[in-house]
C-alpha cells in the first residue's frame, strides 16, 4: 500500500535500515562504514540461515552475552530466573525464553554502560565484521529458522485462537509499540541500538532469516488466516501452550509474533473474546513472553522474521492495509522502519524488548541517569535516523514517512516527556501491567505517540485485530514512515519511539497471549488517557503542526481503521485479506466514525490531537478499564473507538482549524465510500502526506468534523468538542497548553455530558453538512463558497473553538477571500474565556451564506434570536430551517468585501464584554442598485455581527455570567432579537447588527420633541440602506427629509409622526451601532431649520441648533460651519436676511425642478441601487456643500467690508504704497536721517578706500604680467636661437655625411674595379693552361 519494496520470500531486495552506527547492512557482509543511502538493495540472501554471515553475526552477538562470565546457556534455570528477577523481568517461560529475555536485558545494560553522550559514537559499529563469519551462528540460525517455522505454524494456530481474545491486546501491542516510542529516548535508543546492532551484525542473517521465515511467515499468516477458526478454537483450548509456544516462537522470531498478530488480526474478535478470559491468566505469561520475545527479537531471527513478516504482511496488508490504513500509518511507519531495517527493526524490537527489560531494571536503579541516556540516545538516534534518512526509500515509503514525520514530531515530544514515564516503567518493570501502565504514563508525557499508541490501544478492540496481527507491519509502517519521514530527526524519533513501543508492545503482548497484554495495556493506556488529555494541552503547542498533519492522517487512519475495524469481523468470518477488503468497505463508513478512524487518525493525528484522543480514550476507557477483562476488552474497544472518533474528530478539527478543508474533503470522500474503505485506506497514506500540508492550510475539514461529530457516543463527541475548541485555534491550543492541562480537563469533564449530547446531535448534522461542504469547497472554484455546508462546519468549529478560534476562522476566511466562505461566526464573545474549554464546543453558530445567495431572496426570513437557549433548542437538528437560519448570503463580491470587513472589524464585536450584538439580516434592494459604500458597509456589518453575534449554540456549560454578552435590544424592547427584515425590492440581503445598548434608559433629550431626529456619532462601516433599515424599524421615514453628511457621521431623519421619532430616539440613543462603532449614537430631536440648513436650504444656521451642537458631541467631521461672524450692523443684517430668503426660494425652486427631473433616479437613489446612486448622492452632497461655501464666502465678504474701518487705522498710522499688495511704511525721524547719512558717508569712504586698494593691486598685477611677458619673450628668443643653432649643426652633419658617403662610394668603385681585373687575369691564365695539365688535374 505504501509502495514499499516488498522483499521476495527469498529476500531478493530488501531495504535495510542502517543506523548511524556506521554499520553497513548492504550485503550483510558486515562492511563497517557509514551507510550513504538509507536503503540498500541487498543481494539475494541464501535461504539457509546458516549460510548468512549477518545472521550468524547477529547470533554471535547475542551468544556472546554472558552473565558473571558464564554463557547464558550454561546457567541453570534458577540462575536465569534469579537474574531476571533482579532485573525486574518476567521469570515464566522455558529456559530458551528466559535466556533470550536475559540476553536482551544484558545487552541493553551493556549498551547503556557503553553508550556515550555523543550520538556520533555508535557502540555497535565495531561488532559488524566479527559476527558474520561465525559458522556456529549460521547453524544456530538455521536451527532457529526450522524451529521458527514449526513454532510459527504452532503460533499461527494459537494466535488464531488467541487473536479472538487478544484482538484488543493486539491493538494494544501495536500501542505498546507506540508505547515504546513513548518510552524515554534512552529506552528507545537502547532498543534501537540493540536492534540496529543486531541488524548491523546480522544484516544477512536477518535478511536470509527473514527470507526463509518470509516464506514460512507469509505462508503461515495465510495459513493462520485459513486456520483462524481452527486456531481460535485450538487457542482457546491451548492458551497456556500458545503462550509458551509464543514464547518459543518469540525466541525464534518476533516476526512470527508479528505474523501471528496478522493472523490474530484476522482472528482478533475471537481472540478478544478469549482475551477477556485469558487476560488475567496471561498477564504474567505475557510479561514473561514479552521479555522472552524481547530477548528473542533481540536476536537476528527477529529481524528476518520482521522482514518475512513484512513480506507476508505486505501481501496480507494489501487487503489488510487498506483496512489497517490508520494502523498502517503506525504500521507503515513500523514497516518503513522494518523494511528499511525490517530485520534491523525486528532485531531492534527483540533487542529493545530485552533492553527494555534491562532498561526497566536499570532505569529503576538509573532513573537519574535516564535524561543523560535519553540525550545520548536521542543524539544517536537522530544521527542514525539522519544516516538512515539520507537515502530515503521509494516515494511510497516517503509518503508513509510523511505521516510518520508527524508521528516523529509527536514522538519527539514523547521522547522529550517520556523520561518520567520511563521512570515509572523502570519502577514497575516486573509486571507487564505495570509496564503498560508505565507506558501509559509515558504516553501521557509523550501524548502524541501515546495517543497514537494508546488510542489504538483504546481502539484496540477495533484495531487490535489488525494492529496486533501486523505488529511487523505496524513497525514497518512506523519505521518506513519515520525512517522516510522528511524530517530525519523526526523520523528517527518516530522510529525509536515506534520501535521502542514495538518492543514494549511485543513484550507486553507478543510473548504471552498478546491478547492479555493488549487488553491490559489497553486498560492501562485508557486509564492514563485522561492524563494524556491533560498532557496534550501542552503537547498541542509542541505538536500543533504534527497534530494537523496527524489529524489528516487520523482522518485517513480513521478510514483505514474503519476499514480495519470491519476487517476484524471480516477476518473472523473470512480470510484476513478478503474479509478485510470486504468488511472494511462494508463497515468502513460506520466503523470509521467510531474507533478505527479515530485509531488510525490518532496515530496520525498531531501529538496534541493524539493526546486529546488518548485522553478521551482514557477518559472513556477508564470506566471500562475497571471492569472485568471481558467487559474491559469490550468497553476498552468501545472506549477506543470513542476515543478514536474523538481523537479523530479532535485531530480533524485541529486540522480543520488550520485549513483541513481539503483533508476533510478527502476524508469525507473516504467516508462516503465505505466500500472503498480499504482502497481509500491504502491511498490514505499518500493522501495523509498530501493532506498534512493541506492541513496547515486554513480550510476547515468539515467532513472530518462531521465524522468526528457523527460518532454517536456523547462522550466521544464531548471530547471532540473539547478538543475542537482547543484545535479550533492553534493559538488557543497554545494558550491551553500554557494553561494547566488539568484546568482543561475539569472543564471538559464538567461539560462532557451536556456537550456530548448536544455535540452528538450537532456532530451528526454537522457531519453531513460538513461532508457536503468539504466536497463542495474542494470542487468549487475559490470564488464559489459551499454556502450551507461550510456554515455548518463553521458553526461546529466556531462553537467548539474559543473566541480566538472564531476570530481566527474569520481571519482565515478573510485570508481565503477567493473561496467566499462567509461564515457568520455566531460565536459568542465569551469564547475568549472559553478558549480551550469545551464550553463552546456544543454551540454551533448559524451558517454564513454568501451575499445575495440566500435561498429565499424575496422571502422574509423569520427573525431568529440566536441565543444560547435557542441554539440549544436548534442543536438537535441543526439543519437550518429553510431561510430561518440567521444566514447572510453574499454575492461573490459581497462576500469578498465582507471578508475584508471581517478582517477589519474582526475584533470589534468583543470590545463590549457586557454586550451581545445581535445582527438582523434583512434583504434589501436589488443587488444591482446598491452603492459600493453601502455594500461594503453591509458586508462590514455582517462580519462584525458575525464576530460578536455568535452566541454559543449548545454550550450549556455554565459560563461565567460576565462572559456572556447581555443581549440588549436597542429597539423599543431591550431584548434585541435577530430580525430578518426583507424588503421585497430585493435581492441583496443586508445584515444589520442590532444596536447594542449599554445604558438601560436613554438620557433625556436636549431639544424639543419633534418628528425630526438628529443622530450623530455614526461611525462607518454601514450603508445607507442599513442605516435606513435601522431607522425604519421604529417608524416611517420621510425620504425627502432624510439627510446624512458625506462621511456618514451624523444624519437627520424625519418621521411621519412625533411618536415614531420618540420611539427612534428611545431605541437608538446611547446605543452602539454598527457594532464596530467605538462611540455611542447620540439621538436627539432637531428642528426643521437645522435640517434645512444642512440640506443647504438655509444660509444661516438656526441659533438654537448652533448652541445645541456646541453642547452636544458633534459628528467626527460635520460640514464646517460658516465662520462665526461678528454681530453685523442692523442694516447689513436686514440685507442679509432678505438675501437669504431670496436664495432660499431660488434654491427651493431649483430643488423642485431637480426632483422632478430626477424623480426616478432619486427613487433608485433612495433605495440605494448600486448603479450609480452613490456618485449621484456624492455630487448632491458636493453641490450642497458648494452652496454652503458660496454663502459662507458671501458672508465673509460682508464681514470684510464690516472689518474695513479698523483697517483704515493702518492707513492712518502708516503710509501706504499704491501698488496692489500695499506696503505700509513710515518716514524716518531726524536722528534716524542723520544716522543714516553718516552711515552712508562711512560706507562711501569705505568703498573709495577699497576701490583704491583694488586699483593698486590691479596695477601691481599688470606690472607683474608685463614682466612675465618680457621674460617669456626672452625665453622664446633663446629657444629660437637654440633651434637655429641646432639646425645649422644638422646641416653641417648632413654635409659631412654626404661627403663621407661619396668617399665610400669611390672606394667601393675602386675595389670593384680591382676585382674585375683579377677575374679577367685569372680567366686568361686558365685558358692558357695546357689541356694536359687540366686533364692530369682531373
UniProtKB/Swiss-Prot annotation:
Pfam families per the UniProt record, alphabetical: RSB_motif, SAP
UniProt keyword list: Acetylation, Apoptosis, Isopeptide bond, Methylation, mRNA processing, mRNA splicing, Nucleus, Phosphoprotein, Ubl conjugation
Modified residues (N6,N6-dimethyllysine): 654
Post-translational modification: Undergoes proteolytic cleavage; the processed form is active, contrary to the uncleaved form. Phosphorylation on Ser-1179 by SRPK2 up-regulates its stimulatory effect on cyclin A1.
Modified residues (Phosphothreonine): 253, 417, 423, 975
Comp. bias intervals (Basic residues): 1175-1192
Cellular location(s): Nucleus; Nucleus speckle; Nucleus, Nucleoplasm
GO biological process entries: apoptotic chromosome condensation; apoptotic process; erythrocyte differentiation; mRNA processing; negative regulation of mRNA splicing, via spliceosome; positive regulation of apoptotic process; positive regulation of monocyte differentiation; RNA splicing
Self-association state and partner proteins as the record states: Found in a mRNA splicing-dependent exon junction complex (EJC). Component of the heterotrimeric ASAP (apoptosis- and splicing-associated protein) complexes consisting of RNPS1, SAP18 and different isoforms of ACIN1; the association of SAP18 seems to require a preformed RNPS1:ACIN1 complex. Interacts with API5. Interacts with SRPK2 in a phosphorylation-dependent manner.
Record's protein name: Apoptotic chromatin condensation inducer in the nucleus
Organism of provenance: Mus musculus (Mouse)
Amino acid at each position: 500500500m505504501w509502495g514499499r519494496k516488498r522483499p521476495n520470500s527469498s529476500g531478493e531486495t530488501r531495504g535495510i535500515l542502517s543506523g548511524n552506527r556506521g554499520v553497513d547492512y548492504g550485503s550483510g557482509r558486515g562492511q563497517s562504514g557509514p551507510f550513504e543511502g538509507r536503503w540498500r538493495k541487498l543481494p539475494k540472501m541464501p535461504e539457509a540461515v546458516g549460510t548468512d554471515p549477518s545472521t550468524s553475526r547477529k547470533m554471535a552477538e547475542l551468544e556472546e552475552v554472558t552473565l558473571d562470565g558464564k554463557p547464558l546457556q550454561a546457567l541453570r534455570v534458577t540462575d536465569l530466573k534469579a537474574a531476571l528477577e533482579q532485573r525486574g523481568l518476567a521469570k515464566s517461560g522455558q529456559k530458551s525464553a528466559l535466556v533470550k529475555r536475559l540476553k536482551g536485558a544484558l545487552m541493553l545494560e551493556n549498551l547503556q554502560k557503553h553508550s556515550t553522550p555523543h550520538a556520533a559514537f555508535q557502540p555497535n559499529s565495531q561488532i559488524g565484521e566479527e559476527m558474520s563469519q561465525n559458522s556456529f551462528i549460521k547453524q544456530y540460525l538455521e536451527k532457529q529458522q526450522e524451529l521458527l517455522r514449526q513454532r510459527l505454524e504452532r503460533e499461527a494456530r494459537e494466535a488464531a485462537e488467541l487473536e479472538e481474545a487478544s484482538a484488543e491486546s493486539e491493538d494494544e501491542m501495536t500501542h505498546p509499540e507506540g508505547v515504546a516510542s513513548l518510552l524515554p529516548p534512552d529506552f528507545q535508543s537502547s532498543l534501537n541500538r540493540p536492534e540496529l546492532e543486531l541488524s548491523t551484525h546480522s544484516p544477512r542473517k536477518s535478511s536470509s532469516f527473514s527470507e526463509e521465515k518470509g516464506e514460512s511467515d507469509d505462508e503461515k499468516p495465510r495459513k493462520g488466516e485459513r486456520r483462524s477458526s481452527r486456531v481460535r478454537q485450538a487457542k482457546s483450548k491451548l492458551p497456556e501452550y500458545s503462550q509458551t509456544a509464543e514464547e518459543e516462537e518469540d525466541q525464534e522470531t518476533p516476526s512470527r509474533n508479528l505474523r501471528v498478530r496478522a493472523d490474530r488480526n484476522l482472528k482478533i474478535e475471537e481472540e478478544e473474546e478469549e482475551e477477556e478470559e485469558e487476560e488475567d491468566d496471561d498477564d504474567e505469561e505475557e510479561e514473561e513472553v514479552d521479555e522472552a520475545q524481547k530477548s528473542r527479537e533481540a536476536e537476528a531471527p527477529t529481524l528476518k522474521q520482521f522482514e518475512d513478516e513484512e513480506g507476508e504482511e505486505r501481501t496480507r496488508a494489501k487487503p489488510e492495509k487498506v483496512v489497517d490504513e490508520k494502523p498502517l500509518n503506525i504500521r507503515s511507519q513500523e514497516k518503513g522502519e522494518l523494511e528499511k531495517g525490517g530485520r534491523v527493526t525486528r532485531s531492534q524490537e527483540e533487542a529493545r524488548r530485552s533492553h527494555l527489560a534491562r532498561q526497566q531494571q536499570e532505569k529503576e536503579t538509573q532513573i537519574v541517569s535516564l535524561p543523560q541516556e535519553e540525550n545520548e540516545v536521542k543524539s544517536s538516534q537522530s544521527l542514525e535516523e539522519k544516516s538512515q534518512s539520507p537515502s530515503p526509500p521509494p516515494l511510497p515509503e516517503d509518503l508513509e514517512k510523511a505521516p510518520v514525520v508527524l508521528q516523529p514530531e509527536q514522538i519527539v515530544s514523547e521522547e522529550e516527556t517520556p523520561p518520567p514515564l520511563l521512570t515509572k516503567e523502570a519502577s514497575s518493570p516486573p509486571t507487564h501491567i505495570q509496564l503498560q501502565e508505565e507506558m501509559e504514563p509515558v504516553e501521557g508525557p509523550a501524548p502524541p505517540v501515546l495517543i497514537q499508541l494508546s488510542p489504538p490501544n483504546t481502539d484496540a478492540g477495533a484495531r487490535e485485530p489488525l494492529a496486533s496481527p501486523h505488529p511487523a507491519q505496524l513497525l514497518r509502517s512506523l519505521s518506513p514512515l519515520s525512517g522516510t519521514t522528511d524530517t530525519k530527526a523526526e523520523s528517527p524519533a518516530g522510529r525509536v519511539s515506534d520501535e521502542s513501543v514495538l518492543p514494549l508492545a511485543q513484550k507486553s503482548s507478543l510473548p504471552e497471549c498478546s491478547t492479555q497484554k493488549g487488553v491490559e495495556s489497553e486498560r492501562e493506556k485508557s486509564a492514563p488517557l485522561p492524563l494524556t488529555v491533560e498532557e496534550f494541552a501542552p503537547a498541542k503547542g509542541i505538536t500543533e503542526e504534527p497534530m494537523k498533519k496527524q489529524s489528516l492522517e487520523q482522518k485517513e487512519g480513521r478510514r483505514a481503521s474503519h476499514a480495519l475495524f470491519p476487517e476484524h469481523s471480516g477476518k473472523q468470518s473470512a480470510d484476513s485479506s478478503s474479509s478485510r477488503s470486504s468488511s472494511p468497505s462494508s463497515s468502513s463508513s460506520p466503523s470509521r466514525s467510531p474507533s478505527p478512524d479515530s485509531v488510525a487518525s490518532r496515530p496520525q493525528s498531531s501529538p496534541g490531537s493524539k493526546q486529546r484522543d488518548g485522553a478521551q480514550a482514557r477518559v472513556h476507557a477508564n470506566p471500562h478499564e475497571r471492569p472485568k477483562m471481558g467487559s474491559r476488552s469490550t468497553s476498552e474497544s468501545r472506549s477506543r473507538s470513542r476515543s478514536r472518533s474523538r481523537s479523530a474528530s479532535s485531530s480533524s478539527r485541529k486540522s480543520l482549524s488550520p485549513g483541513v478543508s481539503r483533508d476533510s474533503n478527502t476524508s469525507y470522500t473516504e467516508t462516503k465510500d465505505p466500500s472503498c474503505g480499504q482502497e481509500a485506506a491504502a491511498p490514505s497514506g499518500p493522501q495523509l502526506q498530501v493532506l498534512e500540508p493541506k492541513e496547515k492550510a486554513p480550510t476547515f475539514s468539515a467532513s472530518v468534523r462531521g465524522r468526528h461529530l457523527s460518532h454517536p457516543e456523547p462522550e466521544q463527541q464531548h471530547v471532540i468538542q473539547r478538543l475542537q475548541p482547543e484545535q479550533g485555534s492553534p493559538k488557543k491550543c497554545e494558550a491551553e497548553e500554557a494553561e494547566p492541562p488539568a484546568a482543561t480537563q475539569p472543564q471538559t469533564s464538567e461539560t462532557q455530558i451536556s456537550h456530548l449530547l448536544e455535540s452528538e446531535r450537532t456532530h451528526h448534522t454537522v457531519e453531513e453538512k460538513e461532508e457536503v461542504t468539504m466536497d463542495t469547497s474542494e470542487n468549487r472554484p475559490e470564488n464559489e463558497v459551499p454556502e450551507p455546508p461550510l456554515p455548518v462546519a463553521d458553526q461546529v468549529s466556531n462553537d467548539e473553538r474559543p473566541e480566538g478560534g472564531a476570530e481566527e476562522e474569520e481571519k482565515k476566511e478573510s485570508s481565503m477571500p477567493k473561496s467566499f466562505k462567509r461564515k457568520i461566526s455566531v460565536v459568542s464573545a465569551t469564547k475568549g474565556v472559553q478558549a480551550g474549554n469545551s464550553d463552546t464546543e456544543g454551540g454551533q453558530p448559524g451558517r454564513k451564506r454568501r451575499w445575495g445567495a440566500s435561498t429565499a431572496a424575496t422571502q422574509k426570513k423569520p427573525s431568529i434570536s440566536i441565543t444560547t437557549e435557542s441554539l440549544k433548542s436548534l442543536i438537535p437538528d441543526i439543519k437550518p430551517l429553510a431561510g430561518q437560519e440567521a444566514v447572510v448570503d453574499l454575492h461573490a463580491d459581497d462576500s469578498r468585501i465582507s471578508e475584508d470587513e471581517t478582517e477589519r472589524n474582526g475584533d470589534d464585536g468583543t470590545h463590549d464584554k457586557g454586550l451581545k450584538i445581535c445582527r438582523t439580516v434583512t434583504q434589501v434592494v436589488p443587488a444591482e442598485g446598491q452603492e459600493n459604500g453601502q455594500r461594503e458597509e453591509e458586508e462590514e456589518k455582517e462580519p462584525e455581527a458575525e464576530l460578536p453575534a455568535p452566541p454559543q449554540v449548545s454550550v450549556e456549560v455554565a459560563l461565567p455570567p460576565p462572559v456572556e454578552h447581555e443581549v440588549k435590544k436597542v429597539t423599543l424592547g431591550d431584548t434585541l432579537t435577530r430580525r430578518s427584515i426583507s424588503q421585497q425590492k430585493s435581492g441583496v440581503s443586508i445584515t444589520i447588527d442590532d444596536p447594542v445598548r449599554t445604558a438601560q434608559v436613554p438620557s433625556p433629550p436636549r431639544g424639543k420633541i419633534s418628528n425630526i431626529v438628529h443622530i450623530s456619532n455614526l461611525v462607518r462601516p454601514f450603508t445607507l440602506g442599513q442605516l435606513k433599515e435601522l431607522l425604519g424599524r421604529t417608524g416611517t421615514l420621510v425620504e425627502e427629509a432624510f439627510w446624512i453628511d458625506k462621511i456618514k457621521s451624523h444624519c437627520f431623519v424625519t418621521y411621519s409622526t412625533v411618536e415614531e421619532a420618540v420611539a427612534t430616539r428611545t431605541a437608538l440613543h446611547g446605543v452602539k451601532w454598527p457594532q464596530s462603532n467605538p462611540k455611542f449614537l447620540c439621538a436627539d430631536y432637531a428642528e426643521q431649520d437645522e435640517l434645512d440648513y444642512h440640506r443647504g436650504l438655509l444660509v444661516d444656521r438656526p441659533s438654537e441648533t448652533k448652541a445645541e451642537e456646541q453642547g452636544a458631541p458633534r459628528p467626527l467631521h460635520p460640514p464646517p460651519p460658516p465662520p462665526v461672524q461678528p454681530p453685523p450692523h442692523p442694516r447689513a443684517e436686514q440685507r442679509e436676511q432678505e438675501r437669504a430668503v431670496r436664495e432660499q426660494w431660488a434654491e427651493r425652486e431649483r430643488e423642485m425642478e431637480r426632483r422632478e427631473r430626477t424623480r426616478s433616479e432619486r427613487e433608485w437613489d433612495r433605495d440605494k441601487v448600486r448603479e450609480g446612486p452613490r456618485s449621484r448622492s456624492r455630487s448632491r452632497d458636493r453641490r450642497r456643500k458648494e452652496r454652503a461655501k458660496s454663502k459662507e464666502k458671501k458672508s465673509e465678504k460682508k464681514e470684510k467690508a464690516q472689518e474695513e474701518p479698523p483697517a483704515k487705522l493702518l492707513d492712518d498710522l502708516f503710509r501706504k504704497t499704491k501698488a496692489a499688495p500695499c506696503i505700509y511704511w513710515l518716514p524716518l525721524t531726524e536722528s534716524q536721517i542723520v544716522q543714516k547719512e553718516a552711515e552712508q558717508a562711512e560706507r562711501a569712504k569705505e568703498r573709495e578706500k577699497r576701490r583704491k586698494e583694488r586699483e593698486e593691486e590691479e596695477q601691481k598685477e599688470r606690472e607683474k604680467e608685463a614682466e612675465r611677458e618680457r621674460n617669456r619673450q626672452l625665453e622664446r628668443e633663446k629657444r629660437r636661437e637654440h633651434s637655429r643653432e641646432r639646425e645649422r649643426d644638422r646641416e653641417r652633419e648632413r654635409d659631412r655625411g654626404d661627403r663621407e658617403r661619396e668617399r665610400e662610394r669611390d672606394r667601393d668603385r675602386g675595389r670593384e674595379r680591382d676585382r674585375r681585373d683579377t677575374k679577367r687575369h685569372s680567366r686568361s691564365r686558365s685558358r692558357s693552361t695546357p689541356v694536359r695539365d687540366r686533364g692530369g688535374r682531373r
